Amino acid sequence: MAQRKNAKSSGNSSSSGSGSGSTSAGSSSPGARRETKHGGHKNGRKGGLSGTSFFTWFMVIALLGVWTSVAVVWFDLVDYEEVLGKLGIYDADGDGDFDVDDAKVLLGLKERSTSEPAVPPEEAEPHTEPEEQVPVEAEPQNIEDEAKEQIQSLLHEMVHAEHVEGEDLQQEDGPTGEPQQEDDEFLMATDVDDRFETLEPEVSHEETEHSYHVEETVSQDCNQDMEEMMSEQENPDSSEPVVEDERLHHDTDDVTYQVYEEQAVYEPLENEGIEITEVTAPPEDNPVEDSQVIVEEVSIFPVEEQQEVPPETNRKTDDPEQKAKVKKKKPKLLNKFDKTIKAELDAAEKLRKRGKIEEAVNAFKELVRKYPQSPRARYGKAQCEDDLAEKRRSNEVLRGAIETYQEVASLPDVPADLLKLSLKRRSDRQQFLGHMRGSLLTLQRLVQLFPNDTSLKNDLGVGYLLIGDNDNAKKVYEEVLSVTPNDGFAKVHYGFILKAQNKIAESIPYLKEGIESGDPGTDDGRFYFHLGDAMQRVGNKEAYKWYELGHKRGHFASVWQRSLYNVNGLKAQPWWTPKETGYTELVKSLERNWKLIRDEGLAVMDKAKGLFLPEDENLREKGDWSQFTLWQQGRRNENACKGAPKTCTLLEKFPETTGCRRGQIKYSIMHPGTHVWPHTGPTNCRLRMHLGLVIPKEGCKIRCANETKTWEEGKVLIFDDSFEHEVWQDASSFRLIFIVDVWHPELTPQQRRSLPAI
């Protein structure tokens, strides 16, 4: 309407303005008026488009653009990840995205910014600017040309400037520090871990043991490793591995599980940052057991991830200065050559991060074939094999990964961070398979390569402990404490060794101060166990305070029940009746045949052939206590059974005891004047039966938790030895009993087959 009104007023004005002029000028014909009305321009010029037509075309073009955009997104016609990744290389001012300021810099209208890129609070993380910017060289040329054309046009639209002739944007400014965040996540290189996305074992909740976790080394700071590589936006020439939760398979034949009461040997709680699982190697005709995977409590996990951090530890980590110390520089995993093939490495790593393990293995194998001197390609291959071993539960594949980690370390020009991570992971996986001596050699090499890294020396000390070499372990921790006297990890392990050497009072301050330090790897059930035990032996009443603290921190089921190799959910009580166990037939058989069992035991004693061996677990305060074992870890001792053939034949009828791989069947003789310290057994998976054979009338008693009982000849006592128990023999003659361990009645058949032996 406005346009039409203007046209009319224009005509009237023309008529009145000319007055009595010529008729051709003074009045317009209808045709002329129509021409003016529809063909004229609002400024009086003819021949242009009307406003209405212009608006219509504008709307058509806008709608066409909208629907085109919808079609592009809907049909996935453009790989936005790829395009955005291309735009990222033109981030000239380092603010993490491509905008008008970047365009001005590239067109020479603005000085290049030297400020640090701003990081949103949710993404804030300490990082270093890359030392060397390397253009991405492995992208297809046609994609790069297309991206450049898009960038050129976009630049000029945003700044309304003349096209810069002959300017090569890629040469003007190489790749900067922040590619797309999704790519960053996939660029992270464990796990195992651990991590490595956790692969849950295929067992029901009640079949999963309650794990007590230990962070075994102070190189824990580096051992968030092996799974995520560092974000390229912060350091494009490096990658940061992060521990994955790894659950693999244990070569049980290679590991001797020590009874927890034996204090002279550091138990093989293998593998920092991992949770141990086992695949039993069954006979080929029994495929069912081949898939048995049980989460074993002899596992080592970062305490911070698995347990509620105690107040003392919170006090330590809540300190801002302490947090600043924890922050570490992210490792650099790419050498100069690997930077030139970074795009190919990233593509292969992206497959691994997306869980396409088989494809990732093939991709890294191809990279190793093409670039045999590339440490990062070979490291990626090792990680993929590591992941594949986890996926397939294959020790054979894991052995291949261990070998590939070694190959990484043998290449020339390996970045120091990558070398350290490769060898640490190799050592970790060797321990996992029970190859303790091989792991020790790897740790020794690490210490030689990085002599100033005390965390590696702490790892080395653990390596010695795992093979029972307490003397060398002690030397290592003495060296660490001479350099860093407040190293809590070294303190608890040094105290552990002193206690194993029966230096009880001397061990207490090291164990206590080490736990109180809150350092990683110190919140370990074994250290609470041995600290409390040491205090009990010197008469320190604070022992139960530490047991209580260990219970609150999740290491013990209760103050009384302090076993560390446990299955969740099992009924827990100190004393049991035969009916409660369900093993009434076994109890009746033992009590009916107690004289037969007694006579064979006495005959073995009379032969004086040394079949009764002294107790060697350092459980006695004083006295003489010996044992004669018929079954151990579910295995019959044929030589021993020759001395008690009828007893062994009798027991063969009861698999709940002969098949108990977490217990023993044995004679136990204790002479007058013997006192056994308060102690607990290693596991809640068994119950212990005591059959009285030769019992003095008075002076012999046993306490379990807070109830004390005495033996009777021909009668069975049943208790759960995962509860604290203590024995006195103050009679005038020896005491002989027959000990029979049985599976806890609530364990399923599958658990009984699958649980590792103790």
Swiss-Prot record:
PANTHER family referenced in this protein's UniProt entry, alphabetically: ASPARTYL/ASPARAGINYL BETA-HYDROXYLASE, ASPARTYL_ASPARAGINYL BETA-HYDROXYLASE
Residue sites binding 2-oxoglutarate per the record: 625, 668, 688-690, 735
Presence of the UniProt keyword Manganese in the record: no
EC code: 1.14.11.16
First and last residues of every TPR repeat: 341-374, 454-487, 489-521, 525-557
Enzyme class of the recorded protein, top EC level: oxidoreductase
The protein, known as: Aspartyl/asparaginyl beta-hydroxylase
The encoding gene: ASPH
Protein's organism: Homo sapiens (Human)
Transmembrane domains' residue ranges: 54-74
Tissue distribution: Isoform 1 is detected in all tissues tested. Isoform 8 is mainly expressed in pancreas, heart, brain, kidney and liver. Isoform 8 is expressed in kidney (at protein level).
Cofactor: Fe cation
